């Protein structure tokens, strides 16, 4: 593939593919130890179309990374419309939007952060990072029964945990700059998930909870003898955590009243073989048919849950903006589901609010190009039909019969933005 590059500098798309491939194969302790985002120049046409068409057939490694365009500020209307049209035509939600100037403005708001840096973000785009810097994430699970008092206590505990984690700065195999940045900023990432399972949210409530996090960290940092964190609050996409705790993911609505949830497993993993022989519906992964199996589970949302069919794209964006302004010192990660007749209005909203759009990704409401998508809509009849095909029970004690040797393999979690953070891999833990 790279023979044609002999004697010249690599193109960004070639560097991107190399990094994606490295991310795919580097495994430590049986877990894939990489997460990737590519922030590319506005004029980079190859990166703009990296996930256009049937990209997974020949460039499957690109599923390992999120792709966003790094705007330096609000572009001219014509420039914005060309990029917006490309995003629409890709049907994959990429490239997403990352506004470096908006990120810098957001980082400056609390007055605690040095902003003379070329800020980027983490792969899921909820943490504003300098170069050579880490995330430090903790999560609050919001339940329908939570009130301000219980959420206050959850935020306090998550902040204490994150502050303790910020003291772990012994990075023996990294350059000193990583340690210096980590110790100087002591970043936290106190996140909320299950947001739309509760209707408590107002600007006042969010501001109160943010202040709880800031004051808790300030006191805890003083007790530990470390600097106060320069940025604390965010909203993670929480695709995996939400599955574990049965909540809506991050700031997103639940997918639908009835849907299919897909889960990936490595064919060498004893758990994959056990689930196959237990009768759970499965098929080969279209991107890795020889090594990966996709399992399908019919799901039903809890009664009264907010689903994505109940929120317009503009409502999702306005909700995002409220959390951006009143909860986050970093930013809320979001993938906005856009119906076919909403793209023009959504583009107008994004352009109007561009100075605050630090980072957002978009995905067509239904006909996106990801095969074996993490969520697939079904109706009630289909749900009960598929449920009848599921095994009545599984004797998990028999899993030991399959675990004859160490067959640990790297979990291949796909990238987080544009719906792919919802991909769950059974071998990732």
Name these PLM-found stretches.
Residues 2-13, 144-152, 172-178, 198-206:
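Inter-helical turn/loop segments and adjacent helix faces that build the functional surface
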Residues 1-142:
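Active-site cavity-forming subdomains of large catalytic enzyme subunits
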Residues 17-28, 162-168, 180-197, 235-241:
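Core structural elements
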Residues 87-89, 99, 106-174, 184, ...:
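Catalytic alpha/beta core of large soluble enzyme barrels
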Residues 3-8, 67, 177-181, 202, ...:
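Short beta-alpha connecting loops at secondary-structure transitions
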Residues 30-75, 169-179, 192-237:
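Internal maturation/activation junctions in enzymes
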Residues 408-429:
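Short acidic, low-complexity intrinsically disordered linear motifs used
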């Amino acid at each position: 593939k790279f023979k044609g590059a002999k004697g010249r500098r690599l193109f960004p798309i070639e560097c991107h593919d190399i990094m994606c491939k490295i991310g795919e194969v580097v495994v430590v302790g049986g877990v894939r130890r990489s997460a990737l985002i590519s922030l590319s120049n506005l004029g980079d046409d190859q990166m703009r179309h990296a996930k256009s068409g049937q990209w997974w057939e020949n460039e499957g490694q690109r599923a390992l990374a999120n792709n966003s365009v790094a705007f330096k500020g609000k572009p001219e209307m014509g420039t914005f419309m060309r990029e917006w049209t490309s995003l629409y035509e890709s049907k994959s939600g990429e490239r997403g939007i990352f506004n470096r100037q908006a990120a810098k403005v957001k980082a400056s708001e609390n007055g605690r952060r040095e902003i003379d840096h070329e800020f980027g973000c983490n792969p899921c785009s909820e943490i504003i990072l300098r170069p050579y810097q880490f995330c430090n994430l903790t999560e609050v699970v919001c339940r329908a029964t939570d009130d301000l008092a219980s959420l206050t206590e959850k935020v306090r505990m998550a902040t204490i945990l994150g502050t303790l984690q910020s003291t772990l700065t012994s990075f023996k195999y990294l350059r000193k700059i990583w340690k210096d940045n980590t110790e100087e900023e002591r970043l936290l990432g106190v996140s909320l998930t299950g947001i739309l399972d509760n209707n408590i949210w107002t600007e006042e409530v969010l501001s109160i909870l943010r202040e709880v996090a800031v004051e808790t960290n300030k006191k805890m940092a003083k007790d530990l003898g470390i600097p106060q964190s320069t940025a604390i609050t965010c909203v993670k996409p929480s695709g995996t955590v939400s599955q574990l705790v049965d909540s809506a993911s991050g700031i997103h609505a639940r997918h639908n009243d009835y849907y299919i949830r897909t889960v990936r497993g490595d064919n060498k993993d004893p758990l994959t073989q056990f689930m196959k022989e237990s009768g759970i519906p499965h098929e080969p992964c279209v991107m890795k048919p020889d090594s990966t199996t996709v399992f399908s589970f019919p799901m039903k949302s809890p009664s009264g849950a907010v689903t994505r069919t109940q929120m317009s794209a503009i409502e999702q964006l306005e909700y995002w903006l409220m959390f951006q302004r009143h909860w986050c010192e970093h930013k809320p990660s979001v993938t906005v589901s856009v119906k076919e007749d909403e793209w023009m209005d959504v583009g107008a909203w994004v352009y109007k609010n561009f100075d605050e759009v630090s980072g957002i990704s978009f995905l067509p409401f239904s006909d996106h190009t990801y095969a074996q998508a993490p969520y697939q809509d079904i109706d009630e009849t289909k749900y009960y039909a598929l449920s009848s095909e599921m095994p009545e029970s599984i004797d998990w004690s028999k899993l030991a019969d399959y675990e004859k040797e160490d067959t640990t393999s790297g979990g291949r979690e796909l990238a987080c933005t544009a719906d792919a953070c919802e991909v769950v891999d059974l071998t990732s833990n």
